[in-house]
Amino acid sequence: MRPDTSDFRELFLSGVAMLDVRAPLEFARGAFPGAVNLPLMDDAERHEVGLCYAQKGQQAAIELGHELVSGQRKAARIAAWAEFARAHPDGYLYCFRGGLRSQLVQQWLRDAGVDYPRVSGGYKAMRGFLIETIDTAAATQPWFVVGGLTGSGKTDVLADVPASIDLEGHARHRGSAFGRRALPQPPQIDFENALAIDVLHHLDAGWRALVVEDEGRFIGSRDVPQALSQRMQASPLVWLEAPFNARVERVLRDYVQGLAAEFIDTKGSAEGFAAYATRLREAMAAIAPRLGGARYGKLAALLDQALARQAESGEVALHRGWIEVLLRDYYDPMYDYQRAQREARIVFRGDRDAVTDWLLAHTARQGE
């Protein structure tokens, strides 16, 4: 039998399958990418056992747990765990603290002829390791931050630089009022866990520096871990430049054509387009107080005209109208001001090819 493990680094780097035996509610609050939830107790059973523990102590709670999970219910759960173990012979199981629940699952599997190791310390210890990974990387690793005006292609640059961490990808949000995607953002803990595992892989790869896109503390409603956010605000800034027309086309691609495709893929043609149109209108309305009444009215009318044409014929050209005004009169002045405030941090500026080449040269592994 393989031994239990507390080598969290190897667990996450290897990407082995993990069987989470916590209750569904615990799993929904935060989990690791790819982990499978096959609980020892469902939410109601866990609640009953928890009340019993508080009122009568541990032994009574254990006895109640055995009573609740017995007979066919117990047999079905053991069968599901055994099937997982056979499908993932290199995997591990865990509960919240690596205590009674995972030990019991391990024993029941052993009684059924299946030896399967568990993670010592459970979810709590692994979660602590991931938090420490981000904090340590923020404190000790060199970072570069890619900035630029809206539509300059910062995310495209990240895709070309292997040492980059895609915060917006992990947050499932493009980081502005118009940044919401068709699918909801992951829970905060899931965002942090996936981000930390990504950072761990990048540290293991040996890059001389890591690269992120310029972000505020929040990406949508997801909170960038404080240590990383503070490090980003103090790190060298690489400024990406792009012509205005190219930026308009990139916004059209990502925030109009791409977003419409996401919604249609998720909800179907008619319902998806309606949800996409609603999302754009909501985004415009969200910045109405900062636009002012007259400018908001103009932009909302341009957006409505563009959506009507798109619904009728699929043509997206009219969207350029509101995009151009929004960039020129709203986003560009805002980001120009922010850039001026941080001018001293800019260590390089250039177009996509120049910025990509510079980042590749300054993040390459030692000896490359």
Curated annotation (Swiss-Prot):
Reactions the enzyme catalyzes: 5-methylaminomethyl-2-thiouridine(34) in tRNA + selenophosphate + (2E)-geranyl diphosphate + H2O + H(+) = 5-methylaminomethyl-2-selenouridine(34) in tRNA + (2E)-thiogeraniol + phosphate + diphosphate; 5-methylaminomethyl-2-thiouridine(34) in tRNA + (2E)-geranyl diphosphate = 5-methylaminomethyl-S-(2E)-geranyl-thiouridine(34) in tRNA + diphosphate; 5-methylaminomethyl-S-(2E)-geranyl-thiouridine(34) in tRNA + selenophosphate + H(+) = 5-methylaminomethyl-2-(Se-phospho)selenouridine(34) in tRNA + (2E)-thiogeraniol; 5-methylaminomethyl-2-(Se-phospho)selenouridine(34) in tRNA + H2O = 5-methylaminomethyl-2-selenouridine(34) in tRNA + phosphate
PROSITE patterns in the cross-refs: RHODANESE_3
Gene3D superfamilies named in the record: Rhodanese-like domain
Highest taxon in the source lineage: Bacteria
InterPro entries in UniProt: Rhodanese-like_dom (IPR001763), Rhodanese-like_dom_sf (IPR036873), SelU (IPR017582)
GO biological process: tRNA wobble uridine modification
Segments forming domain Rhodanese: 12-135
Entry GO MF terms: transferase activity, transferring alkyl or aryl (other than methyl) groups; tRNA 2-selenouridine synthase activity
Job description of the protein: Involved in the post-transcriptional modification of the uridine at the wobble position (U34) of tRNA(Lys), tRNA(Glu) and tRNA(Gln). Catalyzes the conversion of 2-thiouridine (S2U-RNA) to 2-selenouridine (Se2U-RNA). Acts in a two-step process involving geranylation of 2-thiouridine (S2U) to S-geranyl-2-thiouridine (geS2U) and subsequent selenation of the latter derivative to 2-selenouridine (Se2U) in the tRNA chain.
Complex formation: Monomer.
PANTHER family: TRNA 2-SELENOURIDINE SYNTHASE
Family, similarity comment: Belongs to the SelU family.
UniProt-recorded name of the protein: tRNA 2-selenouridine synthase
